[in-house]
Structures are given as C-alpha cells and as structure tokens.
Swiss-Prot record:
NCBIfam families referenced in this protein's UniProt entry, alphabetically: PRK04038.1, uS19_arch
Native source organism of the sequence: Methanococcus maripaludis (strain DSM 14266 / JCM 13030 / NBRC 101832 / S2 / LL)
Keyword Ribosomal protein: yes
Identification of the protein by name: Small ribosomal subunit protein uS19
Domain of life assignment: Archaea
Stretch list, region Disordered: 1-26
Gene name of the encoded protein: rps19
Biased composition (Basic residues): 1-19
Length: 161
C-alpha cells in the first residue's frame, strides 16, 4: 500500500488570499426582528410589540411592572432625552435582570448587576426581545491553577524547597 503525502496546508492559504483580494467587501444586512425594521419597532406601541416577542417575554410584560422596573423606565426615558439633546447619556445601573429589552432601549449603555459587579453592556439591535439578565451572566468559567502542597496524596513525599 502506497503512503499518501500529508497535506501541509501552505498551498491552500495562498489560494485563499488570492480569493480574498478579488471579493468585494460584505455589506451589512439590515436588521429585522420578526420582519420589522428597527425604525418600525421604535414607532410601534408596546402592546403591538408584546404580540411579536416570544411567549416567555410576552407573559412577563403582561404581568405589569414592579416599582423597581418603573424606576428603571424613568431612567431610560431620562437617558433618551439626554441623547436626543446631543449630550452623552451615562451608564444606567440596574439590578432588574428580568426586564425585557424594548426597541427604545437600543443604543443605551446599561450596567447590569450579576451578583458581584455591574457589567457594562451597550444594547444593540440583536438584543431586542431578550431579558437584561441574559446579557450579564452570573457564573463565569473557572480556571484552576496548579494544586498546592498537600493537596494530593502524591505531593506528601515531595521535599519542600
């Protein structure tokens, strides 16, 4: 049986680079949420917006808002007024993780509490219809270091320097 030559991968990279030179830059596709553009969503009344979001969010919005959420709505309106005047809106800090992101919140920066700190998130079009809590995870990936002295049975007999 004859051995096949292993592919080094160098030739393919050159071909890809040539192809990239000939291709025109990609145009950004206009954002649509369930068939509606961002401008249409922002003009839409909240009752109509509730009809197009998923059932979990629709149920949360139908229950009404708590006093803490009402305070957040007031902060959003104040920040929106500042941005309309041309001033830079500050970060809106909140503990309300169960608040549904509405189209009027797009473009604002939120400090969402994750149980330890406020994660600063600038809301973009793709976040419409999600919860604020989805943007700031409460659990991070743990990367452990090497075990300490006496942590394992094998390290009992290793001389300490």
């Amino acid at each position: 049986m004859a051995r096949q030559k292993k592919y080094s991968g160098k030739g393919g990279a050159r071909k890809k680079n040539k192809q990239k030179q000939n291709v025109a830059p990609r145009r950004r596709v206009e954002f649509k949420y369930k068939g509606f553009s961002l401008e249409e969503l922002q003009e839409m009344p909240i009752k109509k917006f509730m009809e197009i979001v998923p059932s979990r969010q629709r149920r949360t919005m139908a229950r009404g808002i708590t006093p803490k959420q009402r305070k957040l709505v007031m902060k959003i309106k104040k920040a929106r007024r500042l941005t309309n005047r041309g001033k830079d809106a500050r970060v809106i800090r909140t503990h309300c993780r169960d608040f549904v992101i509405t189209p009027e919140m797009i473009g604002l920066t939120f400090g969402i509490y994750n149980g330890k700190e406020f994660k600063e998130i600038k809301l973009v079009e793709e976040t419409v219809g999600r919860f604020l809590g989805e943007m700031a995870p409460t659990r991070g990936v743990v990367q452990h270091g090497s075990p300490g002295m006496g942590a394992t049975r094998g390290s009992m007999f290793v001389p300490i320097k």
